[in-house]
């Protein structure tokens, strides 16, 4: 049986590590589920950099995760992905500046798509779902599924959540 692997973004860790956040319980539920079901949990160097803007790297549960450095293959894939997004936005009437910038969520999507073992991408950023959907529509499919943690893990994975 193939082992599941998930790449988690910055917004996931912000929710996981802030007990006051409205999505903290959802993030905690997912993290527990991933650990209990032997998921390989991954974090991008991009997410680490974003987290360190307001947090400290020592706060991240790195001992439970593998770090995915952003590399040459990821960069090429990210450029192709954002070109597709810009083309779709242009079709919808948006004006695109001549100098393209690749947003960090698209870079992490590229990592999830290029790395052969990653089959899930977890985030609390519902806006990046629009980008994911545009890329998926343009290409027909991506190699990973999108997990929106505003939806509890038991709904996504179809399990009963028994209180302990």
PLM regions: where:
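Acidic, PIN/NYN-like endoribonuclease modules and their adjacent C-terminal/linker elements
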Residues: 1-3, 115-164
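Conserved glycosyltransferase catalytic-site signature
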Residues: 10, 45, 101-109, 125
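A generic structural signal for short hydrophobic patches within well-formed alpha-helices
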Residues: 13, 48, 75, 128-129
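Active-site regions of enzymes building and remodeling cell-envelope glycoconjugates
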Residues: 60-69, 137-141
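Acidic catalytic patch
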Residues: 46, 66-99
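Short, well-structured N-terminal submotif of metal-dependent ribonuclease cores
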Residues: 1-42, 52-65, 150, 154-164
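Acidic, metal-associated active-site segment
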Residues: 98-120
């Amino acid at each position: 049986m193939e082992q599941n692997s998930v790449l988690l973004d910055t917004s996931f860790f912000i929710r996981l590590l802030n007990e006051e956040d409205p999505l903290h319980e959802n993030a905690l539920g997912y993290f527990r589920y991933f650990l209990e079901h032997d998921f390989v949990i991954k974090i991008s160097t991009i997410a680490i950099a974003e987290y360190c803007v307001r947090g400290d790297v020592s706060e991240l549960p790195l001992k439970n995760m593998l770090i995915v450095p952003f590399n040459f293959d990821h960069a090429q894939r990210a450029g192709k992905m954002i070109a597709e997004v810009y083309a779709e936005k242009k079709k919808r009437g948006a004006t695109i500046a001549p100098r393209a910038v690749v947003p960090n969520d698209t870079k992490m999507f590229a990592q999830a798509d290029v790395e052969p073992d990653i089959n899930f991408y977890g985030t609390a950023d519902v806006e990046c779902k629009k980008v994911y959907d545009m890329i998926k529509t343009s290409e027909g499919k991506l190699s990973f599924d999108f997990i929106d943690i505003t939806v509890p893990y038991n709904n996504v994975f179809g399990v009963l959540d028994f209180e302990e």
